[in-house]
Amino acid sequence: MDLKAYFELIRLKNCLTAGFGALISGLIASNFTFGALFPLILAFLVVFFICGFGNSLNDIYDLKIDRINKPFRPIPSKRISLTDAKVFSYSIMIFGLIISLFNIYCFLMAVLNAVVLQKYAKIYKKNKIIGNMLVAYLTGSVFIFGGIAVGNVNVSLYLFSCAMFSMWAREIIKDYEDIEGDLKEKVSSLPIKYGEKSIYISLGLLLIAIGLSFLPYLTGIFGIYYLLMILICNLMFLAGFFNLLNAPSKKQARKTSKNIKLITNFVLIAFIIGSIFK
């Protein structure tokens, strides 16, 4: 068994990132209570396995395209057979669902996300207008999952909302970058439908995320240290975005997309600081 190939199939780095997102969100929601550590370790494992399931499914359904565009991937390179990939992907999904039974609400959300991942891989990768929304939800859901695991979703809801809208904006920008390839593959996306106007739709979603990011301070959950850091993050968001508005191009779209992903990590740090220094 080629472990490296299976790690590549599930996209190990993405699975670890998602798992740690749930873990950190749960720690914030529990005010870093030691007793929350065990359910959060379980939450980490659930998110890791369900994310791995989704990533594996993407490779299974993309086999025809990957034979041409990405022949080095585990399945087209025949390091993993298609049958073995299917057995493996559904096995880790089952493992994830079994572990999620430690909390009925975690179990229900794990089932929901597994279904969404299945539908996305099978149907909505070609329809990015809906697909982007699903990816945004899935990204944000890891944070609310951590809150559910410790029985407190108040802060996690803010993290979920900010992450969902900022990632939704990012997905549209990525589509703007990929517009030529998507046209060839007959994929529907907002940039294909609306051209440069789609950048303003993306900006609108980002502004919603920015507006929501102030709520933890305005509602008294976090204090001035959170506010200062979130202000810096939001200014960085806007500065990068206006560069794209002033000079829309594939290169600038790629840069803006990377910036949003990076700054979202700083937003998570702002939530950590806010929860520690109230």
Curated annotation (Swiss-Prot):
Transmembrane annotation, as ranges: 12-32, 34-54, 92-112, 129-149, 199-219, 221-241, 257-277
Keyword rRNA-binding applies: no
Record membrane topology: Multi-pass membrane protein
Protein's cellular compartments: Cell membrane
Top enzyme class: transferase
Metabolic or biological pathway, per its Swiss-Prot or TrEMBL entry: Membrane lipid metabolism; glycerophospholipid metabolism
GO molecular function, one term: geranylgeranylglycerol-phosphate geranylgeranyltransferase activity
Record's protein name: Digeranylgeranylglyceryl phosphate synthase
Organism: Methanococcus vannielii (strain ATCC 35089 / DSM 1224 / JCM 13029 / OCM 148 / SB)
